[in-house]
Design a protein with these regions (language model features):
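Fold-independent oxyanion-binding glycine-rich loops
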Residues: 4-7, 39-41, 69-70, 87, ...
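Conserved phosphate/ATP/ADP-binding segment of small-molecule kinases
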Residues: 44-138
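A polyampholytic, Gly/Pro-enriched intrinsically disordered region
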Residues: 1-10, 84-93, 170
């Protein structure tokens, strides 16, 4: 199999960003969701203006925001209910290799700095780490090693699953 992607990643202009924000505002007003997932692929849709507007609308409407970030906007999601980077993304943000001995503290510092209630770090075959309630509780979630042909979409699956769990008012650690 072979895959080749050719694409341009550029920020939405202010007119398109404003139109997107209007659509999101309309959906919130009419559908009254209790959760929003922001899946940021670093393709230019999630501009500072869009991110700030979505977070503000969510806050005003008591909506939990779940974020799967990418590198460019990593520090723009202040106040998110759950922040789910992968190991490489968090390591790149910190500018160092992740160390199991300091990981809990690194995650907690990030949560405090950006007002992130829950931090879920995916680590591939090492499983996941969940830091809840602004770093008060810390859990290592082991993975079950399996033969996997392709990990494409694994992060999307994780954020979607955790969002459904929270929307159903199930405790995250369970």
């Amino acid at each position: 199999l072979f895959r080749a992607d050719y694409e341009d990643a550029f920020d939405l202009d202010s007119r398109d960003a404003s139109r997107l924000i209007d659509v999101i505002e309309n959906v919130i007003a009419n559908r009254k969701p209790n959760v929003i997932i922001i899946q940021d692929y670093d393709k230019g849709v999630m501009t500072n203006e869009v991110i700030a507007s979505v977070l503000n609308l969510a806050d005003k409407n008591n909506i939990k925001v779940f974020v799967d970030p990418k590198k460019r906007n990593f520090d723009k999601y202040q106040g998110a209910f759950l922040f789910k980077p992968n190991e490489k993304e968090f390591s790149d943000y910190l500018g160092k290799k992740l160390d199991d001995d300091t990981l809990e503290e690194d995650m907690k510092k990030f949560q405090e700095k950006f007002n992130i209630r829950n931090f879920l770090l995916t680590r591939g075959e090492k499983g996941m780490v969940l830091s809840e309630n602004f770093g008060e509780e810390y859990y290592v979630i082991p993975s079950e090693v399996r033969s996997i042909a392709d990990v494409t979409g694994a992060g999307d699956t994780v954020i979607s699953t955790f969002t459904v769990i929270c929307a159903a008012d199930v405790d995250l650690k369970n």
